[in-house]
Amino acid sequence: MLRVQTPKSLDPTKPDPARPDADGAPAAGLDRRSFLAAGTTLAATAAMAPAAALAQGMMPGQGWPTGPEPVRYPSDVWLVHDDRFRQYMIGNTPLRREWTGSLWAEGSAWNGPGRYVVFSDIPNNRQMRWDEVTGQVSLLRMPANFSNGNTFDWQGRQLSCEHSTARLVRYNWEGPWPEVLAEEYEGKPLNAPNDVVVHPEDDGIVFTDPGYGSHWWYEGNVRELELPTSVYHLDPQNGQLTRITDEIFKPNGLAFAPDYSVLYVADTAPTHHPEEQAKIIAWDVEDNGRRLTNRREFAVLERGFHDGIRTDVDGNVWAATAFGGEGVDGVHVYAPDGTKLGQILMPEGCANLAFVGERRNRLFICGSQSVYTLYTAAQGAHVT
């Protein structure tokens, strides 16, 4: 309830100590004109109440904050293509925008012991940190050499793919400066590493090198690519770098199957080869990632392209999707046989995602300018 105090000189029930006749009786000067003036004051003040309430983030007459907007369950972000998708949906959970302020959010990686996500804001040349406990986003590192993909190895050390320096680096415990793990192949500089994963058997590192960080100043650098766009394996024991495939136009996001028998790589070919379609390519993994065999098309996207990808414990592939427009942008989910199970529709194009939380049942999604979370009934595979 809005309470407004009537001015003393206009209140007929209160004495005015400044007046000699202040005995509780109506003041002699309180005439009809004065009462009309008081009514006008009250009306104006009451009219201002809704605006004042909104300015304070409250719904007039309700008493709760105006944002985020309430969502009626079940959320309409779930889109089913195959009934098998329903087992991964939760009806009473919203898509939450946790933070906004990036230009192109990328490279999300979950740190379990620290309960945080590191992600890149490439054009702003910074790495950000989302704290699961507080829900707050803070600056982790700036400058960050226009880093893109990030992950944590099996010792908990952060690996980052740097665009402007065209190298793969690792942040060791003694920090703060990163150790360079790879920056050239056969005497030529790498194009610009993009995304990275780590095999648990021997800590072997697999990363993609499409060169996006060398195409525009906006995301790092401008220079001619001297190497074919490729996927590499790095042996951390001896530093040997091996090209394991160049049979892909623009290798981007990548992920192992939960048993490490398959490597999935997103091909964002249409960005520089408009006659080609965006795809996810699959290979069988040999020798802990040192060799790839049995190349095959796993999924083909008619519009837009898949970028960062993850797998769950059932072997499904969850693919961040952008540049497809409404009805396409968001997350696409594929069964191990390549059947599209469903989608999570998003208000922005999405470049990356990660399963986070103690149970790895919550999606952290990098939209273009914002980051989001969504609880699922799936559980992310325990892969980097």
Map each language-model feature to its residues.
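Short, intrinsically disordered low-complexity segments
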Residues: 2, 18, 31-32, 128, ...
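Compositionally biased, low-structure terminal segments
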Residues: 3-5, 36, 324
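Twin-arginine (Tat) signal peptide motif
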Residues: 27-36, 50-51
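Sequence-structural signature of mature extracellular/luminal beta-sheet repeat domains
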Residues: 39, 56-384
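Short linear motifs in intrinsically disordered/low-complexity regions
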Residues: 12, 17, 22-24, 32, ...
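N-terminal secretory signal peptides
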Residues: 1-30, 41, 46, 56
